[in-house]
Amino acid sequence: MKNINWFDNVEQRPHPWPGLNWLTTSIYVEDVCKAVSFYTEVMKMVSIFELEDDNGELLFARIRYRGSNFIVNKAEENSTRLSPVNTNQVPSFIFYLYTDDVKKMTTEMRDAGAIILIEPEIQFWGDLKARLKDPFGYWWDIAEKI
């Protein structure tokens, strides 16, 4: 079998907005402030930009985890911009996040209100992986290479 270097054809051009990735996930939640607190305090992400409305309500935040960004937006009523909590549906995607300690992050997420869907277990490809639903309805596969 031929060894493949998956990064041979990766575009090396910098993004026009410094600090952004070429592909960024954008999610919608009812309370951006609570979501930012959960992602930064529990999951050890960093909020690098926040935008408030005139009343001081947080509407938007750009969050970073080990060089990858995602955006947290305020869900809007009567709009297609809804959170899984609004729709009572399973999200159509799952975040796959690598960490240094799956068991610790799983426990910390559960203690902060996430629901464990699958306890940490070894996968055939060599990851220890757990699946959780965060308090905002999004699913996370938390993994570490073992």
Mark where each language-model region is.
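Vicinal oxygen chelate
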Residues: 2-26, 37, 43-100, 106-133, ...
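Short acidic-aromatic low-complexity motifs
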Residues: 29-33
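C-terminal catalytic core of tyrosine-transesterase DNA break-rejoin enzymes
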Residues: 136
